[in-house]
């Protein structure tokens, strides 16, 4: 649900003319009513993809508090355009837990068939700070989102924690990355140069009890949210975008 633009101060610290529309509850993307965590979300960037056997929409949203990014969502929603439906490639990271994965919940991983999994890891935002540098190989959607945040005067932490939820069948795909800032729980990270050096890496995190507890908290959130996400995917089968 989108709310009308507001020209007064809000929790995000942005004037409505700068923020644009604020979205809460859920958002229709390519016929799927994508569920959103609580709060007001701002659209940052959007796009489309088209492949020989599939097409769909891409979207990013941000949740801002006092001009600081505290939540981020990246949505990929697509449908098979082949007859018969050709399905979607296997989701990276869902087949096994690797050295970067904090949590893996895999209920099915059949490339080009039934896929149902979610993965938790950390999301390193430092490359976004160089969004204007074309030698920095950012995906176009992330580059546009970072540029929008810069235009709004919004800063963001070095890293956040990501839960990437995926459902796919031969007819469609819904993959959403829900990203949370530990700063909202007053948890900070040591400054590091690379993703692999992060405090949040599975090989490092046991040194930080507060970070272990935060991962456990988000695991509970993921377990609770997962059925809602799966229902949204199933409900979208008969409701393609117009």
Model segments located where?
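N-terminal Sec/ER secretory leader and immediately downstream segment
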Residues: 2-109
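Mature extracytoplasmic/lumenal regions of exported proteins
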Residues: 68-242
């Amino acid at each position: 649900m989108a709310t009308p633009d507001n020209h007064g101060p809000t929790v995000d610290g942005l004037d409505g003319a700068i923020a644009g529309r604020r979205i809460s509850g859920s958002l229709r993307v390519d016929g799927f009513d994508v569920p959103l965590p609580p709060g007001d979300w701002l659209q940052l960037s959007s796009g489309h993809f088209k492949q020989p056997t599939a097409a769909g929409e891409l979207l990013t949203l941000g949740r801002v508090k006092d001009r600081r990014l505290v939540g981020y969502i990246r949505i990929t929603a697509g449908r098979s355009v082949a007859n018969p439906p050709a399905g979607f490639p296997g989701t990276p990271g869902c087949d096994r837990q690797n050295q970067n994965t904090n949590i893996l919940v895999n209920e099915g991983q059949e490339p080009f068939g039934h896929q149902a999994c979610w993965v938790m890891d950390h999301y390193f935002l430092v490359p976004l700070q160089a969004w204007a540098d074309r030698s920095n190989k950012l995906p176009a959607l992330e580059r546009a989102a970072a540029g929008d945040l810069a235009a709004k005067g919004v800063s963001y932490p070095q890293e956040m924690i990501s839960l990437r939820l995926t459902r796919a069948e031969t007819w469609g795909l819904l993959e959403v990355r829900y990203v949370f800032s530990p700063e909202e729980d007053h948890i900070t990270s040591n400054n590091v140069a690379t993703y692999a050096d992060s405090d949040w890496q599975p090989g490092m995190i046991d040194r930080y009890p507060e970070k272990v507890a935060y991962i456990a908290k988000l695991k509970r959130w993921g377990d609770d949210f997962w059925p809602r996400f799966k229902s949204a995917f199933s409900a979208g089968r008969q409701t393609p975008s117009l």
